[in-house]
Structure formats: structure tokens, C-alpha cells
């Protein structure tokens, strides 16, 4: 199956802005993150897993990595990783 992955903000420094990833049918959100870590490095995984500081969107809906890591993905899903902006 193919999953469309978008990286926004500072995560674009670790990976490309947009990419189609081919995964095994039924692969989970966590497996996608593990694959991305192997492709782009551990730095990206650390950034993504800072769940309290980042948004993960699946088809436009917010996902909590702590509770939805094993959620199976579907062909054509769109997963976006969006860091929350901070500053003052």
C-alpha cells in the first residue's frame, strides 16, 4: 500500500517535505515511523516522538502517538507531521 507523508516546519530539515512511502498492507503508524527513522535517521524519530510538542495528522485528524501507534494504515492515507511553533 502507498501512504503519503508530509513533513512541515522544522521537520523538513530532517526529511523531504512530501513523500509517497510503500508499506506492507496493514502496517501501523508506528511501523511507518520506524521506517522513516531508518530512511532519514534517528534524529527524525526523536523529533516525531516528542508527541507533546508535535501534531501527527492522519487524513486530517489528530492522532496521539501514545494511543494510536499500532493503528493500521490504509492505502492512500495521508500522514502529516507538524511541529508546534514555540517562542515568545
Q: What residue spans do the PLM features occupy?
A:
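Ubiquitin-like/PB1-type beta-grasp interaction modules and other compact soluble beta-rich domains
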Residues: 1-87
Amino acid at each position: 500500500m502507498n501512504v503519503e507523508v508530509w513533513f512541515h516546519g522544522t521537520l523538513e530539515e530532517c526529511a523531504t517535505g512530501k513523500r509517497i512511502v510503500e508499506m506492507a498492507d496493514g502496517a501501523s503508524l508506528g511501523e511507518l515511523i520506524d521506517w522513516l527513522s531508518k530512511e532519514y535517521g534517528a534524529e527524525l524519530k526523536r523529533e516525531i516522538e516528542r508527541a507533546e510538542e508535535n501534531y501527527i495528522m492522519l487524513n486530517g485528524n489528530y492522532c496521539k502517538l501514545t494511543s494510536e501507534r499500532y493503528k493500521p494504515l490504509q492505502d492512500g492515507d495521508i500522514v502529516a507531521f507538524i511541529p508546534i511553533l514555540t517562542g515568545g
